[in-house]
Amino acid sequence: MAKWGRQGNRRLTAVFIGVVVVLLAAACGGRQNQPTNDTGVAVTAQPAATAVGETELRITLTAADGRPVSGAAVQVRGDMSHAGMVPVLRTALPGDAGVYTAPFEWTMAGDWVLTVEFTLADGRTGTETFDFSIPTP
């Protein structure tokens, strides 16, 4: 059996130290955003009669006490319930009283899942999903 020798021990030590440094950096890295489950989310489409084509989504964020939540960053992802479709991605713009709007296009009839992801001003995050059914024209 071959001996490691000094050079082999140095390499092994260097690798070990490198692994420890990487693990410590990952463990001590940036602050993780804390999820929130006390923010209410509602989504409506304007016009209310959903059909294939352009619409405006209105996303309303409310605190647990019912107050509107302003200052959030809101992203919307629309996916068909079946595989093979390209998702529709939008950034919602802030409006009045915790209402955020996003232009959106229902690209085809069928069942859709809208995922709303938001980051509050204090860094907490949340995700809610909503089902929409778009009728065949």
Segments predicted by a language model, with ranges:
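N-terminal soluble domains immediately following signal/targeting peptides that reside
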Residues: C28-P137
